[in-house]
From Swiss-Prot:
GO terms for biological process: dUMP biosynthetic process; dUTP biosynthetic process; nucleobase-containing small molecule interconversion. This is dCTP deaminase, dUMP-forming. The keyword Methyltransferase does not apply. It comes from Leptospira borgpetersenii serovar Hardjo-bovis (strain JB197). The active site is at E121. Pathway: Pyrimidine metabolism; dUMP biosynthesis; dUMP from dCTP: step 1/1. Belongs to the dCTP deaminase family. Bifunctional enzyme that catalyzes both the deamination of dCTP to dUTP and the hydrolysis of dUTP to dUMP without releasing the toxic dUTP intermediate. Keywords: Hydrolase, Nucleotide metabolism, Nucleotide-binding. It comes from the Bacteria. The record marks G108, F109 as: Important for bifunctional activity. The gene is dcd.
């Protein structure tokens, strides 16, 4: 089952931590998260799964930044989230999708116990000017049945910013 907005609000500070939190971003069954001003762009193509891939930092100015099709932009949420006893999931807002912007490729599913900023895998299907602080996605929460084992040791746990792919670490095992 998915938590209602009222239930999300009731669990803030307990099972759900969102920092900063604003009641204005609460929806009937989700909470809107905003785009941070920093993006990362991979600088060498093709990308290689077996090694770290280089990136460059791009800041989105207040006046906006033109995103172009065919480029993967890694962004992050402005909000830090932490979730216990629930499964957090992320989805793009419909208003963003209607402009041709995708906020994740496949990583909209979080683990129980995840804490950190959400890295967004941003792409656009037509040129689009984006702005820092815009509400680009929404987080919602599923309840669980059965014994819970929280996510604690993953590559992306307790991150402090945008996380490029660390898939190469899987090859080192």
């Amino acid at each position: 089952m998915i938590l209602t907005g009222k239930e999300i609000q009731k669990r803030i500070g307990k099972d759900i931590i969102i920092t900063p939190y604003s009641e204005k971003q609460l929806n009937p069954n989700s909470y809107n998260l905003r785009l941070h001003e920093e993006l990362l762009i991979y600088t060498e193509l093709p990308l290689d799964m077996k090694k770290p891939n280089l990136t460059k930092k791009q800041i989105i100015p207040e006046s906006g930044l033109l995103l172009k099709p065919g480029i993967l932009y890694l962004g992050r949420t402005l909000e830090f989230t932490e979730t216990h006893h629930l499964v957090p999931m992320l989805e793009g807002r419909s208003s963003i999708g209607r402009l041709g912007m995708l906020v994740h490729v496949t990583a909209g599913f979080g683990d129980v116990g995840f804490k950190g900023f959400w890295t967004l895998e941003i792409s656009v299907i037509q040129p689009l000017i984006v702005y820092p602080g815009v509400e680009v996605c929404q987080i919602f929460y599923h309840t669980l049945e059965g014994q819970i084992t929280e996510y604690t040791s993953g590559k992306y746990q307790a991150n402090q910013g945008i996380q490029p792919s660390m898939l190469y670490q899987d090859f080192e095992k």
